[in-house]
Regions:
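Short histidine/acidic/glycine/proline-rich micro-motifs that form metal-
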Residues: 81-84, 107-110, 147, 169-173, ...
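A cross-domain feature marking catalytic cores of carbohydrate-active enzymes
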Residues: 53, 79-81, 103-105, 143-145, ...
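Short, solvent-exposed loop/turn segments at secondary-structure boundaries
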Residues: 113-117, 175-178, 206-209
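Charged helix-capping and loop-helix junction motifs
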Residues: 120-123, 178-183, 209-213
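His/Asp/Glu-enriched short active-site or ligand-binding loop at hydrolase and phosphoryl-transfer sites
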Residues: 147-189, 223-234
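CE4/NodB-like, metal-dependent polysaccharide N-deacetylase domain
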Residues: 66-76, 100, 116-149, 154-158, ...
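Terminal accessory/targeting
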Residues: 1-51, 58, 66-76, 188, ...
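Active-site beta->alpha N-cap acidic-glycine motif
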Residues: 27-114, 118-132, 138, 234
Length: 235
């Protein structure tokens, strides 16, 4: 009898494994979601690229803003509502410098297996903090870690908002990456319409910050123009 039960349970186990695997890949997919629209890059022949900077703002913001100003390059900052509330002066400085500000949720939690109410609070609370900075432009949205399943995409679709991911991430999960590594990977992967993700606000951010002027100089020499995410999506 046990043998019969074991044989009968195999198809069930296979289905469970397949569902689990499918859910895992769906959560981390950069180019697909179950509802609404997701953008990892814009398909264009024009040599345009968007530089995006995730998390914060933190006390590194003044240094990052100086690097961007010296390079005369626009960026899209995906900021957390909690950090904006804690460091309103940095949010105001980012807005005053003319950069685009995007929504990266309030608490930077993984937005999977969450309730509609949680999604609403995470998104709308951050929108409110962004507007307090004086920023009046479009607010695009990026999920923390790029993770989403059903509730988040459904909410964004209902509110006519796009999920913005990326196609170049040279410093993600690489605590030992040097500025040389980050520059080399970026230059090797950028294509017309690329969205580049860097982390410059927390942790091991020095190499990423140091890489920005070199990335900008090299890509401009190759004929690229830097634009904000909303500008890129309007192409």
């Amino acid at each position: 009898m046990f043998r019969r039960w074991l044989i009968g349970s195999v198809p069930v186990l296979v289905v469970v494994v397949l569902l689990g695997t499918g859910t895992f890949y769906l959560m981390k997919a950069r180019t697909f979601q179950l509802a609404g629209h997701v953008v990892s890059r814009v398909h264009t022949d024009a040599r345009v690229v968007a530089l995006t900077l995730d998390d914060g703002p933190s006390d590194r913001a003044p240094e990052v803003l100086k690097v961007l100003a010296d390079a005369q390059v626009p960026a899209t900052f995906y900021l957390n509502g909690r950090d904006l509330a804690a460091h309103p002066e940095h949010g105001r400085a980012i807005a005053a410098a003319g950069h685009e500000i995007g929504n990266h949720t309030y608490t930077h939690r993984r937005m999977v297996f969450v309730t509609p109410g949680t999604v609403r609070d995470e998104v709308e609370g951050t929108d409110a903090e962004i507007r307090k900075t004086g920023y009046a432009g479009p607010i695009t949205f990026r999920p923390p870690y790029g993770k989403k399943l059903w509730t988040l995409p459904h909410y964004l679709a209902e509110h006519d908002r796009v999920t913005v991911t990326w196609d170049v991430e040279p410093d993600s999960g690489r605590a030992d990456a040097t500025a040389d590594d980050i520059v080399a990977e970026t230059l090797g992967k950028v294509r017309p319409g690329s969205i580049v993700l860097l982390h410059v606000m927390h942790g091991h951010a020095d190499p990423s910050i140091a890489a920005i002027p070199r990335i900008v100089a090299e890509l401009r020499a190759a004929g690229y123009e830097f634009v904000t995410v909303s500008d890129l999506m309007s192409r």
